[in-house]
C-alpha cells in the first residue's frame, strides 16, 4: 500500500475497489506486513461502495514450512477499524488439487454475505471447463 493509492482512494469516488494478493504475491513473493494490512483496514474511501478484494490464493502455500509467513486477519482489522463491510476475502484449493477438482470459499461481513446470497441464488455451477476441451 502506498500513500499514492491511499490518496487516490480517498479523493476519487469513481475508484470502487482494489484487488490484492496479500501472501506470496506474484511475481515478487511479497507478504503484506501487519502495517500494510492495517493501512488497508483504515482506508477512508470517497466511494461508499468501495471494496477490498483480498485474494488469499496462497493461504496454505508456505514457502518455508519451518517459518510460515504470518498474515494478519483483514476481516478483523476492517471490523476493528469501523469498516466491516469493506472487504471480501476468498481462496480456493485449485492449486493444491487435481485440475477441475478445486473448491473455493469466501469470507465477509454478515451484510456482505447476505448480498452475495441474493446474487448466488441465480447462479449455477457448470461443468468443469478444463475437462470439456
Can you annotate each of these PLM segments?
Residues 1-133:
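PLP-dependent class I/II
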Amino acid at each position: 500500500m502506498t500513500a499514492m493509492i491511499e490518496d487516490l482512494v480517498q479523493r476519487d469516488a469513481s475508484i470502487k475497489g482494489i484487488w490484492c494478493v496479500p501472501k506470496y504475491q506474484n511475481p515478487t513473493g511479497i507478504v503484506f506486513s501487519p502495517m500494510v494490512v492495517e493501512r488497508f483496514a483504515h482506508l477512508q474511501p470517497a466511494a461508499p461502495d468501495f471494496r477490498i478484494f483480498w485474494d488469499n490464493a496462497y493461504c496454505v502455500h508456505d514457502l518455508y514450512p519451518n517459518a510460515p509467513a504470518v498474515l494478519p486477519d483483514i476481516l478483523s482489522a476492517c471490523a476493528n477499524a469501523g469498516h466491516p463491510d469493506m472487504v471480501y476475502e476468498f481462496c480456493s484449493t485449485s492449486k493444491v488439487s487435481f485440475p477441475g477438482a478445486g473448491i473455493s470459499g469466501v469470507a465477509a461481513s454478515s451484510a456482505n454475505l447476505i448480498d452475495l446470497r441474493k446474487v448466488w441464488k441465480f447462479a449455477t455451477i457448470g461443468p468443469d471447463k478444463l475437462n470439456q476441451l
